[in-house]
Amino acid sequence: MALKTATSGMWMTDDCKKSFMEMKWKKVHRYVVYKLEEKSRKVTVDKVGAAGESYDDLAASLPEDDCRYAVFDFDYVTVDNCRMSKIFFITWSPEASRIREKMMYATSKSGLRRVLDGVHYELQATDPTEMGFDKIQDRAK
């Protein structure tokens, strides 16, 4: 059963939430990348990163000229030596992508965010410098 997202009329496939929950609870994935399928009007899983993959692997997997959503499970150790985990929701909207695509991603974002319960921080980026690893570290701590 697919879930409808907000005003865009896009449907989110069951695999979208399943992959997110596997990342959040089972730690099977380090990240999940989502893609909008314009013709079928669905949000689908584009790629999942194995537990051993890094933030750099996620950044490298994002296309230079197409928009994507991504969730990333950031693990870190606090100054008190406590292990922590924060989930980031990233909207990737590169300047080279089509205007129509940017608008579709913008209008679908809130619906997808509501379904992906447990996200701690949001990040929007139009080029790689706006989503560098240092930005993730600064936001999480």
From Swiss-Prot:
<feature type="modified residue" description="Phosphoserine">
    <location>
        <position position="8"/>
    </location>
</feature>
<feature type="domain" description="ADF-H">
    <location>
        <begin position="8"/>
        <end position="141"/>
    </location>
</feature>
<dbReference type="GO" id="GO:0015629">
    <property type="term" value="C:actin cytoskeleton"/>
</dbReference>
<keyword id="KW-0009">Actin-binding</keyword>
<protein>
    <recommendedName>
        <fullName>Actin-depolymerizing factor 9</fullName>
    </recommendedName>
</protein>
<dbReference type="GO" id="GO:0051017">
    <property type="term" value="P:actin filament bundle assembly"/>
</dbReference>
<dbReference type="GO" id="GO:0030042">
    <property type="term" value="P:actin filament depolymerization"/>
</dbReference>
<dbReference type="Pfam" id="PF00241">
    <property type="entry name" value="Cofilin_ADF"/>
</dbReference>
<dbReference type="GO" id="GO:0005737">
    <property type="term" value="C:cytoplasm"/>
</dbReference>
<keyword id="KW-0206">Cytoskeleton</keyword>
<comment type="similarity">
    <text>Belongs to the actin-binding proteins ADF family.</text>
</comment>
<dbReference type="GO" id="GO:0003779">
    <property type="term" value="F:actin binding"/>
</dbReference>
<dbReference type="InterPro" id="IPR029006">
    <property type="entry name" value="ADF-H/Gelsolin-like_dom_sf"/>
</dbReference>
<dbReference type="GO" id="GO:0030041">
    <property type="term" value="P:actin filament polymerization"/>
</dbReference>
<keyword id="KW-0597">Phosphoprotein</keyword>
<dbReference type="InterPro" id="IPR017904">
    <property type="entry name" value="ADF/Cofilin"/>
</dbReference>
<dbReference type="InterPro" id="IPR002108">
    <property type="entry name" value="ADF-H"/>
</dbReference>
<keyword id="KW-0963">Cytoplasm</keyword>
<comment type="function">
    <text>Does not display typical F-actin depolymerizing activity. Exhibits a high ability to stabilize and cross-link actin filaments. Functions as an actin bundling protein with the highest efficiency under acidic conditions. May play a role in the modulation of levels of histone H3 lysine 4 trimethylation and H3 lysine 9 and 14 acetylation at the FLC locus.</text>
</comment>
